[in-house]
Regions:
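A glycine-rich phosphate/pyrophosphate-binding beta-strand-loop-alpha-helix module
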Residues: 31-99, 103
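Disordered, low-complexity tails and leader-like regions
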Residues: 66, 319-322
């Protein structure tokens, strides 16, 4: 999420850009992989504060070398059908994209890949971030059913997305999270990390790690569940002061969870700076000689800011020097 840069003023108009793709689903069924890529990216936009019916998509496809193998050609065809089906049911178009059919190295092929990127605009006042905001909040999950062939019920999904937008605009939710690859478990953990606010699950919560795309977790601003009358939802639990996640008789500290979450890629993409133990020499820039007076008494500096297509920050640079 970012505000749109403007010259000589301020704006509340912001842009949202999200993505969706699950390689395991794409490998199992390119049709479902693409369909749920669109669903995931759209739900993420709505969870942030956007509206599903004003979203525009751009799709990135990546497949193995197809050659003259009809089975291989069926993979991108099925993926495009899945993406088109989701777009048609949601009433939103893809206005761009890029494809590559060279995802083969020797005997290794990429999984059938269609990544959906969703773009929308939103007033910054309506933007909601995913981290829990306070303790003793009720946390619910707004759920969308699956129909035959494991395709999401798009009519229910659109109804749920409209409800989330309404709740956000009425300031009735404090935080939101659109379910992704890791399901409820991932959502609650990441929502707890931000402000180190714990969570206690209610009894009987199942399918913690099922990627139920289309479901959205909401931290409610009040305990009034009548806001969700007529909708399919479950109460997951409540936020706590203890910095841990409790489910049944198990309690896991947020510190332990966060370290487990980060350690996989820490050697490749370090997030912690290395302490410098060597003594750093103090360098003195004070001149010992006589100060020289410039022949120019009035300085009028000029700043040259080169800009190129596809780059940004020129407005920020200009503002910094003004």
């Amino acid at each position: 999420v970012a505000k749109i840069p403007v010259l000589g003023g301020e704006t509340n108009t912001s842009t949202i850009m999200t993505y969706g793709y699950n390689p395991k689903i794409g490998k199992w069924s390119p049709f479902h992989g693409a369909l749920y890529a669109v669903v995931e990216s759209v739900c993420k936009v709505v969870a942030i504060g956007g509206k599903y019916d004003s979203i525009r998509l751009t799709l990135q496809e990546y497949f193995e070398k197809l050659g003259d193998n009809p089975t291989k050609w069926g993979k991108p065809f099925a993926a495009l059908l899945g993406a088109y089906y989701a777009q048609n049911r949601l009433g939103i178009p893809a206005i761009g994209g890029k494809d590559s059919m060279s995802g083969t190295f020797k005997d290794i092929d990429v999984p059938p890949t269609l990544v959906s990127f969703a773009v929308d605009t939103v007033d910054a006042d309506y933007v909601v971030s995913p981290e829990f905001k306070k303790t003793n909040s009720q946390v619910v999950m707004l759920s969308t059913d699956r129909l035959e062939n494991d395709v999401v019920d798009f009519e229910m999904l659109k109804k749920n997305l409209d409800k989330v937008t309404e709740l956000i605009h009425n300031k009735q939710v404090l935080s939101t999270y659109a379910l992704g690859f890791g399901g409820i478990g991932e959502a609650i953990s990441k929502m707890a990390f931000g402000n180190r606010i714990g969570f206690k699950f209610n009894e009987g919560i199942e399918d913690l790690f099922k990627p139920n795309y289309g479901n959205i977790v909401l931290e409610l601003a009040s305990e009034d569940l009548s806001l969700l009358d007529g909708y399919n939802y479950i109460v997951l639990g409540s936020t706590t002061e203890e910095q841990s996640i409790i489910i049944e008789n198990e309690e896991i500290s947020l510190e332990e969870l966060y370290n487990a979450h980060c350690e996989t890629l820490e050697p490749i993409f370090p997030t912690k700076s290395v302490d410098i133990k060597e003594k750093i020499e103090t360098i003195n820039f004070i001149s010992q000689g006589e100060a020289k007076k410039s022949s120019i008494t009035i300085a009028k500096p000029r700043v040259f800011i080169p800009t190129f297509p596809g780059t940004n920050c020129e407005y920020d640079l200009q503002r910094a020097f003004e």
